[in-house]
Amino acid sequence: MKFADHLTESAIPEWRDKYIDYKVGKKKLRRYKEKLDAEEEQSSSYRSWMPSVSVYQTAFQQREPGKSRSDGDYRSGPAFKKDYSALQREFVADFIEDWLISFQLSKCNEFYLWLLKECDKKFEVLQSQLHYYSLQKNYERDNLNRSSSNVDMSTSLYAAGLAGRSDSRVNSIDSDSRSVMYGSMPCTKEAKKPRLSLLAYCQKVLKDNRLLPSWPKRGFSLLQDLRQDASSRGRETFAFGASFLETMTTTQARNLLSNAIIEYYLYLQLVKSFRDINVTGFRKMVKKFDKTCHTRELTTFMSYARTHYTLFKHADANVQLVAQKMQQITSSQPTPTSELSSAQRDKEPITWLETQITEWFTTALTNSPKDRKHNTHKLKKLTIQYSISEQMVHRNNRSIVQMLVVGLGIGVSMTLITYTLYLGISSEETSFTHKILFPLWGGWYMVLLIAFLFLVNCFIWHRTGINYRFIMLGEIQSKNGTQFFNNDFATSKIPLKLYFLTFFIVPCAVCSMLSFALEKLTPLGFLYIGIVSFLFLCPSGLIPYWDKVVHTRKWLVVTLIRLMMSGFFPVEFGDFFLGDIICSLTYSIADIAMFFCVYSHTPNNLCGSSHSRAMGVLSCLPSYWRFMQCLRRFADSGDWFPHLLNAAKYTLGIAYNATLCAYRLSDRSEQRRTPFIVCATLNSILTSAWDLVMDWSFAHNTTSYNWLLRDDLYLAGKKNWENGSYSFSRKLVYYFAMIWDILIRFEWIVYAIAPQTIQQSAVTSFILALLEVLRRFVWIIFRVENEHVANVHLFRVTGDAPLPYPIAQVGDDSMDSSDLGSKAFSSLNDIPITPSHDNNPHSFAEPMPAYRGTFRRRSSVFENISRSIPWAHATDFQRPTVNTVDDRSPETDSESEVESIM
């Protein structure tokens, strides 16, 4: 594999702009090659190419890293004029000094320093959490044979915690953890838990499956909170109340800390990957430059970079440390891991941090040798292997078999479905086939079509480098390691999901074909419902690869239940995303009423939308569910914008479907027509504007090259490497999407102005429903792309790892027992990880917060809203926690990394 492809495969999507632009460098070298060849042809004399002293070796050693070079300093170096030709000196100045060092290396080094700053802050939080965990474990050990209230335990725990916060916290963690680990408490088991009652068991099952209802965190104090400072607002909530700490056990705390440490360890691996692959890229780029321009700059460049840039210093220290360890292993010398890592913190901080958290994970958070062995094995699986793609994907690529089944199944199904559509459209309008079979089976077709188009969306995101899996799942699961960042089609699991969907499409096509042929709904309608139920409940061994889609089946069922009970649960990505998709499936949902009407005593000719109120009620449900989700988001975060405005939008959606139903039931009377047109017009205008401005973040930019578009357009391909602009032809897809979305939003006009025969036609309803599904297909592409853009601007690559104990600002010792209620539940990402712009010379301009709690001083309402609009889409949901807190010990992963990919 070429290094450029390897860099593309290994690059973390959210950090892609911070890597060395290797392909641009190759294009520059090709241009230099052409100039050199042209000069060689024009030259009549032989030109000797001799190795030289570096152009920038003497002139730049006096320059501090990060400061810009003056042209006079560079051109005044004596070595600059001595050995190279004029063209060579021009290339060295333009490529190595102006582009590679001043731009590319400075960019990578500054971002690496920012990552190190973030790693240190998260490490301090975890260090504090381990200290509290040790105190709690000591407390429970000392009070094992006597009872004490949970409130007293929390108070004494944090009193001791505040008293013990000092510079020697690392040593206290080590000593405290060793005093309670299995070494000094041989095989000590926790007190036997009493048998759970039926109610407690049901609550536990619901909590494990994210189905336990919860009160909004800010629901009862929302009016008072509206006047509080913005720093206390916008916090996310999960399925835990303010008294979370009062019921926290050491096992629950250990599980939460284990998940947080795993995610932090994986984050360190990603930082190390970023550093190492960039160092390799710079070395290879200078080597290519030497080969193209006949120079010998590699040695001097590497020496200069190791001296002046932290990126190269740490990479070189890591190589030396690995070599030292290998030498000690081969010579059978003891390796003082702790002492060595402590001495290397300044030289190689990533390795030092890895050593510390490995010690915590395998010692402080284990109760037995078995737990230690399990945790050690778990960390080993998280180590990045650059050859993972070639070794695992191409040798045992099961996706080939899965795609073969998909191709055969969908190919046959499309033939049968097309024929049934022909029969339904060509049948008489009063026939059972046209009025009953065509709408009912058409509703199933819409559900399967939107599922198939969603997987097409996944392929588009996969090809354009959009990290949709992080957005969908909320975080990187530990058992999957770093495979999400390996850009191979087999690792995307798209073939597996298509394989899963094929088992629903093929039976639907066969059953619908038989139903149309026999002109009967019974028993084929019930048969297909039974097949769908069986496929969701099917044991893993009956269908090949069915054990690989257990999580998918469970996720669909759980998310659908959470959607139907919107308002009782915090809104996660899957909840709001599935809700938006179902808003485009009102045609299918309304058919549920028709299905029951067919088997009731009602005549079949009265089961259509022109006679059924139930169909109108069901068509309002998707908008109602999203309305309740918006209210829950407002109750959780306390931010009226954009959640209340979004709720108003879905209120118009309910009004639109209700007035459409009333208009149909009134036999298209003028009295009902006017309210319908008013509601439909308002709904279309607001939803179209919301799609473009809020969900897609369009129509903000009127000055740059991308008129009305964002600055980052992943579907437009690569930017021009010379001027940084996108090709206009590639940007047209965004403008077409904007026009398409607006046009389909106004498709209701057909019901208002078309002749009555067209309005009442089942074919018209089917076509309009199909257009809405296609509009949603386009909407999904740009909605997820916009979410990815937000993650890129925030450099967000991990989810929220919940922590068992309150956290304070890093370096802030002012937390006391009064904070237990307000900070009872925290996450590793609650701390301010952005470096200070005043104290850090390598700072980044991050985007404006996606939401604001209170209006800041000297800012108007309009100014606050206008600043929030570009990032408001990120507040539609809150990221799920890493794991549900329970009393179970960490379980062994059900499948290996290889099995999870294949």
UniProtKB/Swiss-Prot annotation:
Domain of life: Eukaryota
Extracellular side: 426-435, 519-522, 576, 754-761
Biased composition (Acidic residues): 892-902
Listed InterPro entries: EXS_C (IPR004342), SPX_dom (IPR004331)
Protein's UniProt keywords contain Transmembrane: yes
Positions where Phosphoserine occurs in the chain: 172, 179, 859-860
Keyword flag Membrane: yes
Chief place where the protein resides: membrane
Membrane topology, record value: Multi-pass membrane protein
Region (Disordered): 882-902
Entry GO terms, CC: fungal-type vacuole membrane; mitochondrion; plasma membrane
Location relative to the cell: Cell membrane
GO biological process: cellular response to phosphate starvation; phosphate ion transport; signal transduction
Domain EXS as annotated: residue spans: 606-815
Membrane-crossing residue ranges in chain numbering: 405-425, 436-456, 498-518, 523-543, 555-575, 577-599, 733-753, 762-782
Described function: May function in G-protein coupled signal transduction.
Note: Present with 1160 molecules/cell in log phase SD medium.
Family: Belongs to the SYG1 (TC 2.A.94) family.
Protein name, as recorded: Protein SYG1
Native source organism of the sequence: Saccharomyces cerevisiae (strain ATCC 204508 / S288c)
High-level lineage: Eukaryota, Fungi, Dikarya, Ascomycota, Saccharomycotina
Gene expressing this chain: SYG1
